[in-house]
Amino acid sequence: MTKNDTCKRLLAAAAVLLAAAAMLHTLFVGLEIDEEYALSLGFRLVRGDRLFYSMWEPHQLSALPPALLIAVYTAVTGTTTGVLLFVRVTMLVLKAVLSVWFYRSLRAPLGRTNACLLALVLFVFTPKWFLGPDYVSQQFHFTLAAFLFFYGYYAPGPQQYRGLWRVAAGAVCACFSFLAYPQSAAAAPFLLLGLWLLDRAAPRRCGALLFLVSCAVCGGAFALWLLQGMGFDLPALLARAALILNDPQYDFTAGERLHTLAGQAAAVLQTCRVPALAAAAAVLAGVLSGRGSRPAPARLLERLLWYFTFFLTLWCTAHSLISVSLDFRHLYLAAALAGGWTFCCDRREVQHRTLRRLLFWLGWLPGMAAYLFILRSTLIALCTTFMYLFWPALCGAAALALKSPAAPHRRRQTQLLLLCMLLAAALPRLWLVQQTGWRCGTVREVAVQRITTGPAAGTWADEKAADMQECLYEALAPYAGQPVLQAIGEQHGLGFLMADGTLTVAQASVISGTDSDPRFEQYYTVLPEKQPRVILYDDAEVRDMAAFHTWLEQHFTITDRYTVQHGTASLQVLIVG
């Protein structure tokens, strides 16, 4: 073994250890409202709530995977205590499996080092910085699984065009991705087109047709299940779906959304200014140095875009740590755009042509289509939406790595870029801690406490979040089997999983604020059997809940009320007669 090989192995081991440390920190530390929401959705299904009938959640179509995990855990243990850690461990194992699968699939064309670095970036990345299977996480991971199944069928090699079951399995994964985040179904036509084009490369291939049939079967089966939950009353199902889709939070036009994004674009451009100047200087220096022949303008632009991605990755990593923020995902926008230009420049390259087409038609293009549709429909800020560009960015980076073995200095540059992408994903996870209220602090600033009871037992969170979990446990422990309403602006989804998982949810939605959603009142008129027996108020409420609290106390007979306190948390418990 040469000295160079030893250095490579040591660096690879260090990268693996860095990724493992980052994900272990994510596994045990931090608690965020959207992760709680994901588990509460699954819990509602486990406790007998039905989609659209008694669940009026905006993201209820993502409830199936967490419901399966919670059902398995409660069936084995008989309790929900510690279920959050179980779900996180399961997700971490699945991420590891997907990453190893990705590495084994692409190590031959990309090279071991490139494939390893990309797989580690894939392992460390989570869209919302927690491991729980919320709708965004499901959309990403099912998309990845679908691609890997399709890749296994179409990629050159001894198994090419063998095992049509791979296409069917990929279609099922794609359907779960669309179900988790329906806007991502915009990728479906491009997937179908890509499969059809790949089928044309060989006679008597029917991958596109099988994809279409599999999606139709999955969609039909899911529709029948929904209808069964509504008593096979199609008009009632359509009316309920229209009611839920008419969420006041999302009542904006395409023009209004475009105006909002345009206002936020200036800040994004300001962020990109310095890396863009550095990239231009690097390209200019390379041209003026006179080494080698001068590349064509298209290749110069490609080089500029990838240099820009490199410098922006460094900038995002530094500012994430310095500014104590998790929202510096701009590098994924740069990598996605650079990758798109690389696909364009290399479209006539003979080497790795099939692999390049796979990455483009089944990865980059569907990912970009899904992102544009999500961008139109989501409420989040422009810079936050860049998390949805990770998959196109990864496909673009893989396209860059496809040609790096032909030029040693380009190979080193590509590996340096991939290493920086790994650092950008891993270092903030090690240095920052997610806090209550979509904030974060450094590991030196945030004093984390171990949660010892309830569904989050065995994890650590900031003092406020940990105290609230303990307070919820103490407040709800006496009311096993009772329907609970949290009349709280910032819902605590894990609160419904207290009392060993015997509670039921007595409200329309766990995530839509009761202070701003008038459908909460309509819910009890349409479903009188869902009236609560226990109501919780948060004494440290961050929203104006006075009007809704007044409505509750006018429409429900309150027979008792008292306060439960634990550390910084204080809850009022109201008993309905």
What is each stretch, according to the model?
Residues 127, 163-182, 188-193, 216-217, ...:
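Membrane-interface alpha helices of multi-pass inner-membrane proteins
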Residues 39-43, 54-81, 177:
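Short hydrophobic/aromatic helix or loop-helix immediately within or flanking a transmembrane segment
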Residues 139-158, 166-174, 197, 335-339:
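Specific aromatic-rich, kink-prone transmembrane helix
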Residues 131-140:
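Short acidic/glycine- and proline-prone juxtamembrane loop motifs at membrane-interface regions
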Residues 57, 182-184, 188, 428-512, ...:
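Short periplasmic/luminal acceptor-recognition loop of GT-C membrane glycosyltransferases, typified by
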